[in-house]
Amino acid sequence: ITDKANENFKWIGIIKLFLPNSIILHCERDQSDICFSIFKNNFNSKNMNWSSKPEHITRYYDLYKKMMNFWKKECGDFFYNISYENLINNSENEIKNLIKICNLKWDDRCLRFYENNTTYVRTTSAVQARMPIYSKSIGNYLNFKDFIKFN
């Protein structure tokens, strides 16, 4: 099961309790890039009212980092950390590592995930999930750094 919702970090304790053999794949990304991505997507959920102002996003990001650090200390073997930037810039190697960590069999189609049009994606990145890996989101916030601050 893969779920990349912004608030999944809140459920790590429950996941560990009910799925003790599962692994949390934690993708870490530059703080300003991730905060800007949240800001520009304009989430209209009452559960994500923190996502409309840069200062609220930054505060929420700080909470997320504190919680992730706590859970990594409590159950580090339950986590696999991957750098977003490494995943983008060294995709084949990083994807092979992910497949290995999940005890799955390698298949070259893993590098062509975007060709699978039967996968249901219900997030703001549904279009991106159907595209090859690209790097234009790395440093994207730099275009707006004079107008918006996230750290």
Residue ranges, per PLM feature:
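Generic beta-strand/beta-sheet core signal
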Residues: 3-5, 25-28, 82
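Residue-identity detector for glycine
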Residues: 13, 21-22, 76, 139
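Conserved nucleotide-binding/hydrolysis micro-motifs of P-loop NTPases
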Residues: 8, 29-34, 87-89
